[in-house]
């Protein structure tokens, strides 16, 4: 191992790196940031095998130099798609918001210190961590590779609060509760607050259902865009249409 700022560097086995990047479904359209890059292995694989633009952040200057030499030896040094570069920097002083994929092999306390920054990223950003969790933010997938664990999350949109839902030229109050990617809530129909069913939030995509006073179930799917949502709905009698919602 090699000492970084807050972590002792231990290389991640190749098959774990592969699985991490596969879990994140990395493509040449992605910008992968590896936080705590060590020898650059994850950033190099993201560029070479997955065709992504990759940037590793490494605090130890010697290690960063070594990682860039590894990228050059692998034929992927540089910027742009299919290229990897390792920057000597502090991960907590680094702007990560442009990344579409974040990879981590840090200590639990560092994951937790980064967590607010990660949750503030663009909904749909993919995050993979080797060995360590994000505590009560449950992973969307856990893979095991020769006894080592890799955890995957997708940054959820922020939907908690009260919304005005418009569908079929009718307005209703939609109240949403949220704990990370888990959501629940109700729709106000006159004096009745009908509970939501089959709720799901995956990145910017939301779905929920409820049974109206007419005893008909309606299924809503849509996309969250800040203080707005829009999508389509269907009811079990074959009716369908568009819906929008605005945050109050």
Q: Where on the chain are the PLM-derived regions?
A:
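Class I SAM-dependent transferase core
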Residues: 1-27
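Central antiparallel beta-sheet cores of small beta-barrel/beta-sandwich binding domains
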Residues: 159-248
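Active-site segment flanking the S-adenosylmethionine/decSAM binding pocket
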Residues: 84-126
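Glycine-rich SAM-binding Motif I of class I
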Residues: 40-44
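Conserved class I S-adenosyl-L-methionine
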Residues: 29-38
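C-terminal substrate-binding/active-site "lid" region of AdoMet-derived donor-dependent transferases
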Residues: 109-160
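S-adenosyl-L-methionine
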Residues: 64-98
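Conserved SAM-binding motif I beta-strand of class I
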Residues: 53-58
